[in-house]
């Protein structure tokens, strides 16, 4: 309904047209602000979209930390959004971020993971939580008011993993469980149909994408069709073992800059210091 108020439509394809580039995204942020809405909840929301589209890994062959230009674009955009009031100054997983996804939220949208839609966003959308007797149905909060589009760039946000315990006495059983959950097409299709998550079967997801599958939470949208189209565009060629730690330290350091407590240069210095403390083998 916020999209309809700002853009005059809540059709996912038409909303995507309005958000298909970062320049267009910025223009919609301005339109949303004029209507009293925030474009994003907080500092971290768009981070993964930028960090997943870098030109090189965080660390080069000489163990030198390299801050990609695309990550600096996130810094500049987020500072602009903060100063102009286009975000709500929240951080991922905090109470403000969660509340912004609920019935009283005034945020245009959220960059989410496939698993986050059903495991997190759905729960946050309810006026009466399931544990308090509420039902996952239209009429409870803003259940049914959300929809999904691709946004300015394709990106990824982790996944759902299953690991075996080292030294298990049931190696064959564990193998069978893992293979069934992660490689059996019928099982994975059932997981998607039951949870709305996107699973590890290209052919299975394409079958659901072309079926009459729909999500009541997403207003009847077949979001698997969108994911099946978007997933092949994701590139993971620049991932490294340092990503988790360096991404966390970079976001943490930049938050002080966004809040106006330090300059950009000081925030960068603080990042390098924290990064090298975490990974002593790296250099600035």
Regions of interest found by a model, annotated:
Residues 33-43, 183-195, 277-284:
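Bilobed periplasmic-binding protein-like "clamshell/Venus-flytrap" ligand-binding domains
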Residues 1-3, 117, 187:
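A generic structural signal for short hydrophobic patches within well-formed alpha-helices
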Residues 5-17, 123-139, 211-217:
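Charged, glycine/proline-rich intrinsically disordered loops and linkers
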Residues 46-54, 72-176:
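Extracytoplasmic/periplasmic substrate-binding proteins
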Residues 7-12, 55-64, 157-162, 231-235:
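Flexible glycine/proline-enriched surface loops and loop-helix/loop-strand junctions
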Residues 120-125, 152-252:
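C-terminal lobe and pocket-closing loops
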Residues 5, 245, 249-260:
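Solvent-exposed, amphipathic alpha-helical segments
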Residues 1-46, 59-92, 166-172, 262-266, ...:
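Helix-loop-helix "hinge/cap" segment bordering the ligand-binding cleft or interdomain interface
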